[in-house]
């Protein structure tokens, strides 16, 4: 996809959870297509590393330390962005909580962590983001992977979908959409289809599309060869 087709050249885009996984890959994708990337992550070293990687691609990038599940962090992050750039053109918020605990073994603390990292963070980003977006801006949320099918993870995903629907109805001038990866991140090039979806949803060719949650099928990486395990099987 060309920069002209996407219409991202010179746009100011904030990517949360940018330090690793899908967030890192998406930050790279926006940088490759000419956007100025604000890399936000709770770990400032990871945010700084990704910003440097984006700059190496020829784009402008700055790191900001921010935990989107903490309302004071969210507020201060958007205030810093406003001081530096004014209004944003777009936001990509990546939910980052993981739970592989069976439903019947789920403890209260883990449940609250899931709600905080995924639902609260999405709510806070939408609340603040909608105040700091330029006209016709966008918010794209990367939801928990579809492979997580335990009741508690499905309920979190549906709650975030509800926020997308509600924001779309309340703010029809903003393109609020979501993407659901089929699995957890494993790295380039296997996560590239999700990056393309996150770029395509906000491109000029997708103008008018809002309130949509797309499921993105990602290829499975090849199994790693474990020579020592193979040798142990020899007689």
Question: Language model features by range: what are they?
Answer:
Residues 173-174, 178-235:
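C-terminal helical subdomain
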Residues 102-103, 110-115:
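Substrate-binding pocket helix/loop in short-chain dehydrogenase/reductase
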Residues 19-20:
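Conserved glycine-rich cofactor-binding loop
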Residues 94-100:
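Conserved NAD(P)H cofactor-binding loop of Rossmann-fold oxidoreductase domains
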Residues 35-49:
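Conserved glycine-rich Rossmann-like NAD(P)H-binding loop of the short-chain dehydrogenase/reductase
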Residues 126-127, 165:
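A short, exposed helix-loop element centered on a Lys and neighboring polar residues
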Residues 138-172, 180-187:
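Catalytic loop of short-chain dehydrogenase/reductase
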């Amino acid at each position: 996809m060309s920069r002209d087709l996407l219409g991202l050249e010179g746009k100011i885009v904030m990517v949360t959870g940018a330090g690793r996984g899908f967030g890192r890959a998406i930050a790279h994708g926006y940088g490759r297509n000419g956007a100025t990337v604000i890399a936000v992550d709770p770990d400032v070293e990871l945010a700084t590393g990704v910003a440097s990687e984006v700059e190496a691609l020829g784009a402008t990038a700055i790191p900001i330390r921010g935990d989107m599940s903490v309302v004071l962090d969210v507020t201060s992050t958007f205030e810093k962005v406003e001081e530096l750039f004014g209004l944003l053109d777009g936001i990509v918020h990546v939910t980052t909580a993981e739970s592989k605990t069976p439903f019947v073994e789920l403890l209260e603390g883990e449940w609250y962590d899931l709600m905080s990292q995924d639902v609260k963070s999405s709510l806070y980003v939408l609340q603040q983001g909608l105040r700091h977006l330029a006209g016709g801006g966008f918010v794209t949320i990367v939801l928990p992977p579809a492979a997580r099918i335990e009741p508690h993870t499905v309920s979190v995903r549906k709650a975030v979908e509800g926020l997308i629907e509600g924001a779309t109805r309340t703010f029809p001038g903003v393109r609020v959409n979501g993407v659901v990866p089929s699995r957890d991140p494993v790295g380039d090039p296997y996560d590239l289809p999700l990056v393309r979806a996150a770029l395509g949803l906000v491109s000029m060719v997708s103008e008018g599309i809002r309130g949509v949650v797309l499921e993105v099928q990602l290829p499975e990486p090849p199994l790693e060869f474990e020579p020592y395990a193979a040798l142990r099987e020899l007689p």
